UniProtKB/Swiss-Prot annotation:
This is Prefoldin subunit alpha. It comes from Methanococcus maripaludis (strain C6 / ATCC BAA-1332). The gene is pfdA. Pfam families: Prefoldin. SUPFAM superfamilies: Prefoldin (SSF46579). Its main location: cytoplasm. HAMAP family: PfdA. Molecular chaperone capable of stabilizing a range of proteins. Seems to fulfill an ATP-independent, HSP70-like function in archaeal de novo protein folding. GO terms for biological process: protein folding.
Amino acid sequence: MNEELQNQFMALDVYNQQVQKLQEELSNIDMMIMELLRSIESMEGLKSSKEILLPLGAGAFIKAEAQNPEKIILSVGVDVLLEKDVDEVIVDFQKSVKELEETKELVNTQIQKTNQEIVKLRSELEKRAAAIEQRNAQMRPKTN
């Protein structure tokens, strides 16, 4: 196999790895969006009921009542907490969801472009393989 052909096979492998990483990134983005949407839903729920489920760990919860549901305490860094109004946090989370959706679109576009390159490269490799096969067939001695 000549060097150019080897390079094309390596490029194909790299493209496939890129698509896989981008798909993993999409999955992570989806999980972040879902977490933000659940948080927004929970904060909206605090407006009608102060009752919350407090996680204890290992899938166990206890019913509790929020003392001050108008304020949310956010972790903004290592050992740094910030208190904000619930409506302000909801708006911030909605902005984050929108930004993540935009990022998701960019990642999907990149996946499409990379897949187009994969299709193009595979087509080239198939043509070359067919040409090599034809050349080899012509070089074989014919038997009667």
